[in-house]
Amino acid sequence: MFKFNDEKGQLKCSFCGKTQTQVRKLVAGPGVYICDECIELCTEIVQEELAKDEEVEFKDVPKPIEIREILDEYVIGQDNAKKALAVAVYNHYKRINSNSKIDDVELAKSNIALIGPTGSGKTLLAQTLARILNVPFAIADATSLTEAGYVGEDVENILLKLIQAADYDVEKAEKGIIYIDEIDKVARKSENPSITRDVSGEGVQQALLKILEGTVASVPPQGGRKHPHQEFIQIDTTNILFICGGAFDGIEPIIKRRLGEKVIGFGSEKKNAEVNEKHVLSHVLPEDLLRFGLIPEFIGRLPVIANLEPLDEDALVDILTKPKNALVKQFQKLLELDDVELEFEEGALIEIAKKAIERKTGARGLRSIIEGLMLDVMFELPSRKDIEKCILTRETVANNAPPKLVLQDGTVLDTKTSA
């Protein structure tokens, strides 16, 4: 029988045998002792077992309006894209719940194409959807993919990322979401099929066809290239939702040409082109994607096309302040942990938005701009106990002037004089 104490009379954990001096806590029960380390280990084991037993249920998928409302909390603007995504996602998981058949009518899968400029929110929309639905989510970069037989990443490695996101629970992964970014970069270089092989373009599209439509794929557990005598993970992609996003730079002239507008013109025609410039992507059709360089079979696997508009100054200011995880709120929280209040003046927010537009980075570039502005302040403040408030002004952003620092006695300093 296990002894509860050693020769020196110290109490021991009944499970691991460590003495009370070797652990932080020893909990006593009827005729038994357990240490904090064993409690933590047991908790992890139970949680893992419970997670395995949980079946992936999608009976409570939010309605499209509810999905849209949650997206509004994290993503500013892009109303048309949100509506299209909400409907497509709801129908996708409704299709899964119906076991793909209703009265012998087979419901086809509706993968999604997201078209919009860099930093307009494509990746964030896909990530937020996965969070809403509580499903595994993986991001892949189309530019790293090549067709089988060439140096590069096999398309099956996309599926491995999803399996890893599901903690290697294949059944759970089979109902996840995969976002393939930069899909426009695998467009073939010409509308006409090339005689020579296009390793980075059409070949990748061909390789993606099967997994987009639905197939049982063999995935190497460790990633990399397949080789003989290797064990594979079998995963059915029929119920995986694929969202393919890209900026599709250069598609606007194709759309305008189809709409009968001249790409280069004078007078009223030029004025019309300028008026419609912001909304030209809202007119995109599958035939435009074909002319851009996607093959017909690939376009057919993406029946839902949602476009995102370029973000203007007002939208970028809203992105800085309104979402639940807005950047301004994040930086305010960071300084709050050092007992300092952070304030962004309205003029500063407008200048930050202008810089992002100038750099053509959209919302993606906002964080790097603020990080640059806050570097000196965040370096100095943790060592200062007399600072109560930090104010970023328009001059701070536009002319690299130091932020205002307010001392606890009300004195206003700048970073140059506060050292």
From Swiss-Prot:
<dbReference type="GO" id="GO:0051603">
    <property type="term" value="P:proteolysis involved in protein catabolic process"/>
</dbReference>
<feature type="domain" description="ClpX-type ZB">
    <location>
        <begin position="1"/>
        <end position="54"/>
    </location>
</feature>
<feature type="binding site">
    <location>
        <begin position="117"/>
        <end position="124"/>
    </location>
    <ligand>
        <name>ATP</name>
    </ligand>
</feature>
<dbReference type="InterPro" id="IPR003593">
    <property type="entry name" value="AAA+_ATPase"/>
</dbReference>
<dbReference type="Pfam" id="PF10431">
    <property type="entry name" value="ClpB_D2-small"/>
</dbReference>
<keyword id="KW-0143">Chaperone</keyword>
<dbReference type="GO" id="GO:0008270">
    <property type="term" value="F:zinc ion binding"/>
</dbReference>
<dbReference type="InterPro" id="IPR010603">
    <property type="entry name" value="Znf_CppX_C4"/>
</dbReference>
<dbReference type="GO" id="GO:0046983">
    <property type="term" value="F:protein dimerization activity"/>
</dbReference>
<dbReference type="GO" id="GO:0016887">
    <property type="term" value="F:ATP hydrolysis activity"/>
</dbReference>
<dbReference type="InterPro" id="IPR038366">
    <property type="entry name" value="Znf_CppX_C4_sf"/>
</dbReference>
<feature type="binding site">
    <location>
        <position position="13"/>
    </location>
    <ligand>
        <name>Zn(2+)</name>
    </ligand>
</feature>
<feature type="binding site">
    <location>
        <position position="38"/>
    </location>
    <ligand>
        <name>Zn(2+)</name>
    </ligand>
</feature>
<dbReference type="InterPro" id="IPR003959">
    <property type="entry name" value="ATPase_AAA_core"/>
</dbReference>
<feature type="binding site">
    <location>
        <position position="35"/>
    </location>
    <ligand>
        <name>Zn(2+)</name>
    </ligand>
</feature>
<feature type="binding site">
    <location>
        <position position="16"/>
    </location>
    <ligand>
        <name>Zn(2+)</name>
    </ligand>
</feature>
<comment type="subunit">
    <text>Component of the ClpX-ClpP complex. Forms a hexameric ring that, in the presence of ATP, binds to fourteen ClpP subunits assembled into a disk-like structure with a central cavity, resembling the structure of eukaryotic proteasomes.</text>
</comment>
<dbReference type="Pfam" id="PF06689">
    <property type="entry name" value="zf-C4_ClpX"/>
</dbReference>
<keyword id="KW-0862">Zinc</keyword>
<comment type="similarity">
    <text>Belongs to the ClpX chaperone family.</text>
</comment>
<dbReference type="InterPro" id="IPR019489">
    <property type="entry name" value="Clp_ATPase_C"/>
</dbReference>
<keyword id="KW-0067">ATP-binding</keyword>
<comment type="function">
    <text>ATP-dependent specificity component of the Clp protease. It directs the protease to specific substrates. Can perform chaperone functions in the absence of ClpP.</text>
</comment>
<dbReference type="InterPro" id="IPR004487">
    <property type="entry name" value="Clp_protease_ATP-bd_su_ClpX"/>
</dbReference>
<keyword id="KW-0547">Nucleotide-binding</keyword>
<keyword id="KW-0479">Metal-binding</keyword>
<dbReference type="GO" id="GO:0140662">
    <property type="term" value="F:ATP-dependent protein folding chaperone"/>
</dbReference>
<dbReference type="InterPro" id="IPR027417">
    <property type="entry name" value="P-loop_NTPase"/>
</dbReference>
<protein>
    <recommendedName>
        <fullName>ATP-dependent Clp protease ATP-binding subunit ClpX</fullName>
    </recommendedName>
</protein>
<dbReference type="Pfam" id="PF07724">
    <property type="entry name" value="AAA_2"/>
</dbReference>
<dbReference type="GO" id="GO:0051082">
    <property type="term" value="F:unfolded protein binding"/>
</dbReference>
<dbReference type="GO" id="GO:0009376">
    <property type="term" value="C:HslUV protease complex"/>
</dbReference>
<dbReference type="GO" id="GO:0005524">
    <property type="term" value="F:ATP binding"/>
</dbReference>
<dbReference type="InterPro" id="IPR050052">
    <property type="entry name" value="ATP-dep_Clp_protease_ClpX"/>
</dbReference>
<dbReference type="InterPro" id="IPR046425">
    <property type="entry name" value="ClpX_bact"/>
</dbReference>
<dbReference type="GO" id="GO:0051301">
    <property type="term" value="P:cell division"/>
</dbReference>
